[in-house]
Amino acid sequence: MADEQQQTLDPQAPEQTDAPEAAKDLTARVQELEEQLAAAQDQSLRLVADLQNVRRRAEQDVEKAHKFALEKFAGDLLAVVDTLERGLQMSNPDDEAIRPMREGMELTLKMFDDTLRRYQVEAINPEGEPFNPEQHQAMVMEESATAEPGSVLKVFQKGYLISGRLLRPAMVVVSKAPSETPPSIDEQA
């Protein structure tokens, strides 16, 4: 009987000694699972952020595609606007024979201008302003005693911006300081 009691105690003895090891194993397993959970949550947040970035990039790409399509179309329409403006400049406003045609051209030009403005296409007419190489294209340099050197004297063709970005530069005449004339023979004597 003493042996049976000892045998019943013996099986419990190893369990008691294994309890601290089992607790360590469970603690290690809990820590491992917590690390895996944290890694999974981090990965989930990264995937959500990546998805938002992909969505934002796709929206920007669509917006850019619309802008570039509009930019090309607006650029093609500028030749029509230029032609209407030149036609109005060349026609005599006092000529009664062409008055109805001139009024029609003015209305058509106004409609074009209104439509361009609606799509953020703005004209650049820099006459009298300082030359800006980012928005102007110098066609001719001309001496001027009255204008500040480097300013726009005349505009050959208006430039245009679309949504604040250059669509077409203005073609301009830029002033330069008058050159000093060499003294004449009479002045040397």
From Swiss-Prot:
GO BP terms: protein folding
Domain of life: Bacteria
Pfam family of the protein (one): GrpE
Alphabetical list of InterPro entries matching this protein: GrpE, GrpE_coiled_coil, GrpE_head
GO CC entries: cytosol
GO molecular function: adenyl-nucleotide exchange factor activity; protein homodimerization activity; protein-folding chaperone binding; unfolded protein binding
Region (Disordered) location: 1-21
Keywords: Chaperone, Cytoplasm, Stress response
Residue ranges with Polar residues bias: 1-10
Range of residues in the leader sequence: none
Location relative to the cell: Cytoplasm
Disulfide pairings: none
Similarity comment: Belongs to the GrpE family.
NCBIfam families xrefs: PRK14139.1, PRK14140.1, PRK14150.1, PRK14151.1
Known function: Participates actively in the response to hyperosmotic and heat shock by preventing the aggregation of stress-denatured proteins, in association with DnaK and GrpE. It is the nucleotide exchange factor for DnaK and may function as a thermosensor. Unfolded proteins bind initially to DnaJ; upon interaction with the DnaJ-bound protein, DnaK hydrolyzes its bound ATP, resulting in the formation of a stable complex. GrpE releases ADP from DnaK; ATP binding to DnaK triggers the release of the substrate protein, thus completing the reaction cycle.
Record's subunit section: Homodimer.
Protein name in UniProt: Protein GrpE
GN (gene name): grpE
